[in-house]
A protein has these predicted regions:
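Preference for short coil/turn "hinge" residues that link or interrupt alpha-helices
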Residues: 6, 17-25, 50, 66, ...
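ATP-dependent carboxylate-amine ligase
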Residues: 1-52, 58-63, 75, 79, ...
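Short acidic-hydrophobic, aromatic-tinged amphipathic segments that line or gate anion-handling sites
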Residues: 64-68, 103
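Residue immediately C-terminal to the conserved phosphorylatable aspartate in receiver
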Residues: 48, 68-69, 83
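Phosphate-binding loop of NTP-binding sites
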Residues: 10-12, 32-38, 58, 72, ...
Length: 203
């Protein structure tokens, strides 16, 4: 992510701004919504189905719409989507028609990461979830109170994410759609690499 885009995303992820997350029940979108709410933003979101994830968000005071409808984005200053949500989604189409900026999930995480003194990203073809879980265990044992986003369930957390108050953030960094190229880690760990990731890194 270039500096110009980084600054644009940062401007919209400021306290008091209204942000709408399309696909908010996803494994990396749910903690994103909680982190943004903790930063002082007004967060809403939508997902195709009701789930434990959406119920948790509602319990935390986040308004969640079930189903994707154009009117769900009303009042939003910006919209954030997962890589799996395409331009033909009615909320994305409505945002673009209204001139509301649409950012990718990874771009939002990249900006948030810059607010932490210690940012750790774990990537690779295999072993990301296991390695991220191991790092989380170590940081929790060291009482670093980290913010964590894992692409799986960690019994220690009773979830796949954690919103902490420490100066450390740990993200399992997915290579899908080159998402991890939007991050700004202090430490980057690559586990097993296969051809697809090597191509991404070389280009």
């Amino acid at each position: 992510m270039n500096e110009r885009l980084t600054q644009k995303v940062k401007k919209y992820l400021a306290p008091g701004k209204r942000v709408h997350l399309v696909g908010i029940g996803g494994v990396s979108m749910r903690p994103l919504g909680l982190v943004l709410k903790g930063m002082g933003l007004i967060v809403t979101g939508s997902d195709m189905n009701s789930s434990v994830s959406t119920d948790e968000l509602i319990d935390q005071g986040i308004r969640v719409f079930i189903g994707h409808q154009a009117e769900n984005i009303q009042g939003a200053d910006c919209v954030i989507r997962t890589a799996a949500v395409h331009n033909d989604n009615p909320e994305i189409a409505a945002a673009r028609a209204a001139g509301i900026p649409v950012f990718e999930r990874a771009q939002a995480w990249g900006v948030i990461m810059q607010e932490y003194q210690n940012a750790v990203c774990i990537s690779g073809t295999h072993g990301k979830t296991t390695t991220t879980s191991m790092v989380t265990h170590i940081l929790m044992e060291a009482q670093k109170d980290p913010t964590v986003m894992i692409g799986g369930y960690l019994p220690l957390l009773h979830a796949g994410h954690r919103v902490g108050n420490g100066d450390t953030i740990v993200l399992e960094s997915c290579e899908y759609c080159d998402s991890f190229l939007n991050f700004f880690p202090r430490w980057q760990w690559f586990s097993i690499l296969k051809k697809t990731i090597w191509i991404t890194l070389r280009t």
